[in-house]
Design a protein with these regions (language model features):
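N-terminal secretory signal peptides that target proteins for export/translocation
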Residues: 1-22
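Bacterial N-terminal signal peptides
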Residues: 23-36
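C-terminal/domain-edge helix-coil "capping" segments
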Residues: 42-51, 60-66, 71, 109-112, ...
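Extracytoplasmic
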Residues: 45-50, 63, 67, 75, ...
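Charge-biased low-complexity segments
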Residues: 49, 167, 184-316
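Solvent-exposed, acidic/flexible segments
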Residues: 57-65, 99-103, 112, 134-139, ...
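Short, solvent-exposed, polar/charged sequence segments at loop or secondary-structure edges
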Residues: 66, 80-130, 136-137
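Short hydrophobic alpha-helix segments
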Residues: 84, 156-159, 269, 304
Length: 316
């Protein structure tokens, strides 16, 4: 291997003691460059705000929401909004306790409350008399975590406890809502939702998503525009999941569906959520559908349609 000799350049005299004026200029320049950066780094991040509304008008509903609120207040990254103010704002907006909201309804409610996320719920104690065995009391709390920014249902759960007396079942429920695991689960869900929404916003900015025409509300309006609406080859009904059966849930699920020029489903978004596994059942069913494509003046076009599914608890 050939050795390469590096030749050093002639040495130059360097003055390590610049003038006082030059030092002052350097210090001023450095302060101007660093001060905005220091201001940004020193500025604390705004905590995520959360509103917890009453879980119905019953005594156990108010107690359950109080327990959840007190539990989540221990999370330093969350700022829990005043309960009385949130209640008054929700009532002023006409919210009556529905757990079956559209994205717009949920966003509007969140805007009225002035929060990033909100927890809606319904808690009750019901006396049940089975055909076999003694009667018992069932205490449950259906809780929905909703993003105020997107209006989406982030997650739901329905803890329930059975006991021979109402006091015993309610005590077990309230103890569960005060559990550390519940607190960490909600904090984790909120953090993931924040990160996902930030990622979606960056994706929207980076990508140029093609605009898809929304279908008119009815065939008459479509015909006036020279448009033939898409039709499914065959209609499929979503299954009524066991999670919904246990809650005896009845609700409506709306989904926005993007169809390409071949009538194939390219995207499904829940526009009205219901929880209890009904949203997932609906999306899974819609993804199996195939359509005769939408036509405008005899030419196939991509289109966005709204599909609605009504769920009823099965007859016993």
């Amino acid at each position: 291997m050939r050795a390469v000799q590096l030749q050093s350049a002639p040495r130059k005299q360097i003055n390590f003691f610049p003038s006082l004026t030059a030092c002052i200029r350097l210090l001023v320049l450095a302060s101007l460059i660093l001060s905005p950066q220091l201001g940004v780094s020193a500025q604390p991040e705004r905590p995520v705000t959360l509103a917890v509304l009453d879980f119905g008008n019953t005594a156990i509903g108010r107690l359950a929401s109080e327990k959840v609120m007190a539990n989540l207040k221990q999370e330093t990254d969350l700022m829990i909004l005043d309960r009385d103010q949130s209640r008054a704002a929700a009532r002023g907006a006409g919210y009556a306790g529905s757990l079956n909201l559209s994205l717009n309804e949920a966003r509007n409610l969140g805007a009225v409350l002035g929060c990033d996320f909100l927890i809606l719920g319904d808690a009750q104690t019901i006396r049940r008399s089975p055909s076999t065995g003694p009667a018992y009391f069932d205490s449950y709390a259906s809780m929905f975590l909703v993003s105020a920014r997107s209006g989406r249902l982030v997650g739901w759960e329905r803890p329930n406890f059975n006991a021979p007396t109402a006091v015993a079942s309610e005590t077990a429920l309230l103890a569960a809502l005060s559990n550390e695991e519940v607190r960490h689960r909600y904090a984790g869900s909120i953090q993931r939702a924040v990160e996902n929404e930030q990622g979606e916003r960056r994706l929207i900015i980076d990508q140029q998503t093609p605009v898809i025409e929304a279908a008119p509300d009815d065939d008459k309006s479509a015909e006036a525009e020279g448009l033939r609406l898409p039709r499914p080859y065959r209609r499929l009904a979503p299954a009524y999941p066991e999670t919904a059966a246990r809650a005896e849930a009845e609700a409506m699920v709306d989904v926005l569906v993007d169809l390409d020029m071949n009538g194939e489903v390219t995207r499904v978004e829940v526009a009205r959520w219901a929880g209890f596994g009904l949203d997932q059942a609906t999306v899974a069913t819609v993804r199996q559908l195939h359509f005769f494509p939408a036509m405008r003046n005899g030419v196939a076009i991509p289109i966005r349609v709204l599909l609605r599914y009504n769920f009823h608890k099965p007859a016993k």
